[in-house]
Curated annotation (Swiss-Prot):
Keywords: Cell inner membrane, Cell membrane, Membrane, NAD, NADP, Nucleotide-binding, Translocase, Transmembrane, Transmembrane helix. It comes from the Bacteria. SUPFAM superfamilies: DHS-like NAD/FAD-binding domain. The lineage of its organism: Bacteria, Pseudomonadati, Pseudomonadota, Alphaproteobacteria, Rhodospirillales. This is NAD(P) transhydrogenase subunit beta. The keyword Endoplasmic reticulum does not apply. The transhydrogenation between NADH and NADP is coupled to respiration and ATP hydrolysis and functions as a proton pump across the membrane. GO terms for molecular function: NADP binding; proton-translocating NAD(P)+ transhydrogenase activity. Belongs to the PNT beta subunit family.
């Protein structure tokens, strides 16, 4: 394939990637967006395989077969509720790919056309060192995020004295090693840089609590994009640079939007220490010296069947219990009774960007019934019932009333303004932010203690 034809194919693939991002921004066009991304990637892979510089086809076919087999198994086995940790795992692979490509270029620069051993082009040294640093941070940070999301590591922040000064010192040392390697091509500086970047990725993510996981996933997505762009520079592949820049910039923009939705700066999230695990009070009982009103599935069924407008607020509890299908079934029963049903989604509900949207889409919930915070918040005051299923911190009125609360200033869903709040929860445990939800003790709140899926199924049975 000629160079001109290769560049033309890369441009087509790049345009398809941009259109894919545009399509994925809306649930109704997400399938088409996915298809365009797949076609773009197919064009990119075929074009690269037809490049004159590609010779070891046997190794490439073997790698594709192994990767394809693993991907097929993952697609069939992994549940929709496990998508956040799957995304984190994929980010780690991109980071490690950047590390391996940079290392391969250092050890065999002739194969990459960037010079010879001891005489690598200055620009390539800078590209390699940046790709290595970002890739290593992405890898170790994503591994920690995966561990937290999978429950292998405690979701609460892990902090220790002088943590931030240590990170600052390591950051400065990282920059120094970058400069030293770029100036001297020292293998010692390179591998020291690699170890330091791995350590920094670990130290940056370990103090971040579960409440910030959606932002962390988005941030790591951005890192993986820049790592891919670094690989593109090392390999001299313009499409990889374009794709990496698209992922990196979109991830950064999404991180900013989500931080804005939490009324927090990205620097607060990176510094960590927010999102501790809360204690547990007895289900159906009192938290401290305050009591709550507990109800049954029959109570909830009676209240909702006699309502005219119900707003459903899904959260991480729905994801854990895999209650999305039972929830849609309940909504269908309500609609048959003439009840107006809609869904309210908080931008940081769940453990990754769009987590609730993905689960509701899997349950075939109509897109026109799903609304973001800004679109639906004013509707709670006219709703007869707000049905909250495992959405804790994002419904806590303390975010508006208690300046001492760690979530103070975070925009919340105004569920307390509904006529009745039905709140499904396993116990009186606080959310990932580690603060008690004042909503539990409101006069118009009825707690429904139990597994979200089982409770919803019992409500459906009671309605029938």
């Amino acid at each position: 394939m000629t160079h001109s034809l290769t560049m033309a194919a890369y441009i087509v693939a790049g345009v398809l990637f941009i259109l894919a991002l545009r399509g994925l921004s809306n649930p109704e066009s997400a399938r088409n967006g996915n298809r365009m991304g797949m076609v773009g990637m197919a064009i990119a892979i075929l074009t690269t395989l037809l490049s004159p510089s590609v010779q070891a086809y046997a190794w490439i076919v073997l790698a594709i077969a192994i990767g394809g087999a693993i991907g097929t198994v993952i697609a069939k086995k992994v549940l929709m509720t496990a998508l956040p940790q799957l995304v984190a795992a994929f980010h780690s692979l991109v980071g490690m790919a950047a590390v391996l490509v940079a290392t391969g270029a250092l050890l065999n620069p002739e194969a990459y056309g960037i010079g010879s051993a001891g005489a690598i082009h200055a620009g390539s040294l800078v590209e390699m060192s940046l790709g290595l640093a970002v890739g290593a941070i992405t890898f170790s940070g994503s591994v920690i995020a995966f561990g937290k999301l999978q429950g292998l590591i405690a979701g609460k922040p892990v902090t220790f004295p002088m943590q931030h000064p240590l990170n600052a010192v390591l950051g400065i040392l990282l920059v120094v090693l970058l400069v030293v390697f770029a100036a001297t091509e020292s293998h010692t500086a390179y591998f020291a840089l690699m170890i330091l970047a791995f350590a920094l990725g670990f130290l940056l993510i370990i103090p971040i609590g579960g409440a910030d996981m959606p932002v962390v996933i988005s941030m790591l997505n951005s890192y993986s994009g820049w790592a891919a762009a670094g690989i593109g520079f090392t390999l001299g592949n313009p499409l990889l640079i374009i794709a990496g820049a698209l992922v990196g910039s979109s991830g950064a923009i999404l991180s900013y939007i989500m931080c804005k939705g939490m009324n927090r700066s990205i620097f607060n999230v990176i510094l960590g220490g927010f999102g501790s695990e809360g204690g547990v009070a007895a289900a159906g009982g009192a938290a401290g010296d305050r009591s709550v009103k507990a109800g049954s599935a029959e109570d909830a069924a009676f209240i909702m069947k006699n309502a005219s407008k119900v707003i459903i607020v899904p959260g991480y509890g729905m994801a854990v219990a895999q209650a999305q299908h039972a929830l849609r079934e309940m909504a269908d029963v309500l609609k048959k009774e003439g009840v107006e049903v809609s869904y309210a989604i908080h931008p940081v509900a769940g453990r990754m960007p769009g987590h609730m949207n993905v689960l509701l889409a899997e349950a075939n919930v109509p897109y026109d019934e799903v609304f973001e915070l800004e679109e639906i918040n004013s509707s709670f005051q006219t709703a007869d019932v707000a049905f909250v299923i495992g959405a804790n911190d994002v419904t806590n009125p303390a975010a508006k009333t208690d300046p001492s609360s760690p979530i103070y200033g975070m925009p919340i869903l105004d569920v307390e303004k509904a006529g009745t709040v039905l709140f499904i929860k396993r116990s009186m445990a606080s959310g990932y932010a580690g603060v008690e939800n004042e909503l539990f003790f409101r006069n118009n709140t009825m707690m429904l203690f139990g597994d979200a899926k089982k409770m919803t199924e019992q409500i459906v049975q009671a309605m029938n």
